[in-house]
């Protein structure tokens, strides 16, 4: 399912950056600045009311001086064109301006876009009277928020994203039926909360089996996204991969706009190459901006199983590479570092490049690094070994007994610290998901466990499970059953997963 894109549009100083920070902070998401595309474009990943989406701050637009279309930068236009939802921010305190009218005239021409007028800075004023004049813009209802305080933000995002989710569910009736299940009427939420005991060996065994069955049912086709800055050789690498030992290759336009999904087979394994550069016939490439779209890249990362981050050996690791890397890790995707254009460099320069990689990428020492020449093909074939290794590690089977045993060994070697005269106690661990591997650790005083000890546990699990090429996530829960007595509203994804697990557990208990 394609991740929805939300673009924030408006004149300067209406609170777009404040809303952007409010949205992305909900998941502590990386805010990626990509210099050189247009001035201060910002892209981030966010989650509101159970919906994952990409949010874009298009920067301030002044529609009064040279006309909206001329004043907008190319990337701002592209963001609006590729967005699923456009949030048009206006300042409730300042009132309607000629710049607002100019922007509204442009947006009104894009009738195929979901456009919502959002009146910001409504705190401390009579919001209804101040917002009345914005109805003249002719863009429908005016939503009221106070981005600096977060008031109305969650309700706004849930309102604008719900129609997109319904449209996607309509294309998948089975998923829609699951998401529309009334949890309170079926009573299954209570059964999951109160009857399932994580401390009970029989129940944890059933959970292990349910997760294993779900893992087994997953599509074994590995989706590979090739991402990187402009002119690092992404298209050359794609063509080189497709030209090497291929069996079935054809161009299939994907649901992610303008990205091309290319199925292929190699040594009996099915892959899908996601080319963010847009592999198409030469005659159809008209705009230089198609060479690199941040939006397409971020969506490809979300949709992939393994990401090949391509770096130009002659230019080294840039801040933009690190921004992309941060987004990959935040999305939990498996990673292979590809250093391209390795041919023709003398040994001194190669040593300098390797030294810089070690220095700037020391925080991702779990990822394999390959030095290749996409143009000449040297080293390209070896990429598939690392791709398969990373995917296998990200989807490997884990059991409660295995994870608890590793936890006990880790605490025996290095005990948790004392807090308030009491030692923090880690009781047991169980699998919480895969791709990336998620390990849920239960114990007492989890909120007081230092970050340094969490890193120690993460590294210990990585070494013990031999996880290469994939991030690993640890979740810390207080007590035996953190779900007992709680009736949290589940997200659509959680509803689908809970439905599958409960169905399996009920069948196993008969």
Curated annotation (Swiss-Prot):
SUPFAM superfamilies: P-loop containing nucleoside triphosphate hydrolases. Keywords: GTP-binding, Nucleotide-binding, Repeat, Ribosome biogenesis. GO terms for biological process: ribosome biogenesis. Residues 4-168, 222-395 form the EngA-type G domain. Residues 396-480 form the KH-like domain. GTP 1 binds at residues 10-17, 57-61, 120-123. GTP 2 binds at residues 228-235, 275-279, 340-343. It comes from the Bacteria. GO terms for molecular function: ATP hydrolysis activity; GTP binding; ribosome binding. Disulfide bonds: none annotated. NCBIfam families: GTPase_EngA (TIGR03594), small_GTP (TIGR00231). GTPase that plays an essential role in the late steps of ribosome biogenesis. PANTHER family: GTPASE DER (PTHR43834:SF6). Associates with the 50S ribosomal subunit. Belongs to the TRAFAC class TrmE-Era-EngA-EngB-Septin-like GTPase superfamily. EngA (Der) GTPase family. This is GTPase Der. The gene is der.
């Amino acid at each position: 399912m394609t991740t929805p894109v939300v673009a924030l549009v408006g004149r300067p100083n209406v609170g777009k950056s404040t809303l952007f920070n409010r949205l992305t902070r909900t998941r502590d998401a990386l805010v990626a600045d990509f210099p050189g595309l247009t001035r201060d474009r910002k892209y981030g990943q966010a989650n509101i009311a159970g919906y994952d989406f990409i949010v874009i701050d298009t920067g301030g637009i002044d529609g009064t001086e040279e006309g909206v279309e001329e004043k907008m930068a190319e990337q701002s236009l592209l963001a609006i064109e590729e967005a699923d939802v456009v949030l048009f921010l206006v300042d409730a305190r300042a009132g309607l301006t000629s710049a607002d009218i100019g922007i509204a005239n442009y947006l009104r021409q894009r009738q195929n876009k979901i456009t919502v007028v959002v009146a910001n800075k409504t705190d401390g004023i009579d919001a209804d009277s101040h917002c009345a004049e914005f109805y003249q813009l002719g863009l429908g209802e005016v939503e009221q928020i106070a981005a600096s305080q977060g008031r109305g933000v969650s309700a706004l995002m849930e309102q604008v994203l719900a129609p997109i989710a319904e449209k996607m569910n309509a294309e998948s009736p089975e998923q829609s039926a699951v998401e529309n299940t009334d949890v309170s009427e079926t009573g299954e939420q209570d059964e999951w909360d109160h009857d399932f005991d994580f401390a009970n060996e029989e129940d944890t065994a059933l959970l292990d089996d349910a997760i294993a069955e779900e893992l087994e049912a997953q599509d074994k086709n590995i989706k590979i996204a090739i991402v990187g800055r402009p002119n690092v050789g992404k298209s050359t690498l794609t063509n080189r991969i497709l030209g090497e030992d291929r069996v079935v290759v054809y161009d299939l336009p994907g649901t992610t706009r303008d990205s091309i999904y290319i199925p292929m087979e190699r040594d009996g394994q099915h892959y899908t190459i996601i080319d963010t550069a847009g592999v198409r016939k030469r005659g159809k490439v008209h705009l230089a901006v198609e060479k690199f779209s941040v939006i397409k890249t971020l969506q490809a990362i979300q949709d992939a199983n393994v990401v090949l981050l391509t770096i130009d050996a002659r230019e080294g690791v840039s801040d933009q590479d690190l921004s992309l890397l941060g987004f990959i890790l935040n999305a939990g995707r498996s990673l292979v570092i590809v250093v391209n254009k390795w041919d023709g460099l003398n040994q001194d320069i190669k040593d300098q490049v390797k030294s810089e990689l070690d220095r700037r990428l020391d925080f991702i020492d779990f990822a394999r690094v390959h030095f290749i020449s996409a143009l000449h093909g040297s080293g390209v074939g070896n990429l598939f070994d690392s791709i398969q290794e990373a995917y296998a590690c990200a989807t490997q089977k884990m059991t409660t007994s295995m994870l608890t045993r590793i936890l006990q060994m880790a605490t025996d070697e290095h005990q948790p610290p004392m807090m308030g005269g009491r030692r923090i106690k880690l009781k047991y661990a169980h699998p919480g998901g895969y791709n990336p591997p998620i390990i849920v650790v239960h114990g007492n005083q989890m909120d007081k466990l230092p970050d340094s000890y969490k890193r120690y546990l993460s590294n210990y699990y990585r070494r013990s499970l031999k996880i290469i090429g994939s991030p690993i996530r640890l979740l810390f829960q207080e007590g035996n059953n953190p779900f007992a007595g709680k009736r949290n509203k589940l997200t659509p994804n959680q509803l689908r997963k809970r439905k599958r697990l409960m169905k399996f557990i009920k069948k196993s208990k008969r």
